């Protein structure tokens, strides 16, 4: 049974988080960006951003090429950009310059082409794209603004919770 677009987006987001992009969003998050780009999955880590576009069909891949931020890559988000699909939909020969490819096989993401080594993510000379940092900033602002509107923004001052200890019961409490 074919994987749905929503499933690909969730797999891509989880994949980003497991690969060092601890702040990651999937396609259910919508935000205003200068050129209308809505990421299927995008992740951020110190010094780098990674965009993943989910494709369930070749026609979707071909339609993607007509978007203004694909025609002019400097308008798009992501220092690194990948397509994710099931095998047989996108081949390495289909990739635009600088793009990488991930395939989903038996529910697992496989690195097919272009996934860099750990040190390459932040090396400017290694990055295939100069991402539109204003669009990325607008995207992040939208996420933080929503947290502020819900009264959660002040939690950023609480620091990072590494290993939160389990609460202990005092003898006699249930």
Enumerate the language-model features and the residues they cover:
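Conserved beta-strand termini and adjacent loop/short-helix elements that scaffold enzyme active sites
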Residues: 26-27, 84-86, 104-106, 114
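Non-catalytic C-terminal interaction segments of nucleic acid-processing enzymes
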Residues: 3-19, 93-174
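Active-site beta-strand-loop-beta-strand hairpin of nuclease catalytic cores
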Residues: 37-51
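Catalytic cores of nucleic-acid endonucleases
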Residues: 49, 55-104
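Flexible, charged surface loops at secondary-structure boundaries
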Residues: 17-18, 44-46, 74-77
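Anionic group-transfer/hydrolysis microenvironments
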Residues: 29, 42, 55
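A short, well-structured beta->alpha microelement
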Residues: 35-36, 58
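A short acidic/basic microdomain associated with nuclease active sites
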Residues: 17-34
């Amino acid at each position: 049974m074919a994987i749905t677009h929503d499933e690909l987006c969730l797999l891509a987001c989880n994949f980003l988080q497991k690969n060092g992009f601890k702040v990651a969003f999937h396609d259910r998050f919508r935000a205003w960006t200068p050129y209308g780009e809505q990421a299927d999955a995008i992740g951020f880590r110190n010094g780098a951003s990674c965009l993943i576009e989910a494709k369930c069909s070749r026609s979707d891949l071909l339609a993607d090429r007509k978007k203004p931020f694909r025609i002019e890559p400097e308008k798009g988000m992501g220092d690194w950009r990948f397509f994710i699909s099931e095998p047989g939909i996108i081949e390495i020969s289909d990739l635009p310059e600088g793009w990488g490819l991930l395939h989903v096989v038996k529910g697992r993401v496989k690195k097919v082409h272009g996934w860099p080594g750990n040190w390459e993510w932040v090396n400017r000379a290694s990055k295939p794209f100069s991402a539109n940092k204003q669009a990325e900033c607008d995207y992040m602002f939208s996420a933080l603004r929503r947290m502020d509107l819900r009264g959660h923004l002040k939690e950023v001052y609480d620091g990072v919770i590494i290993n939160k200890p389990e609460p202990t019961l005092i003898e006699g409490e249930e």
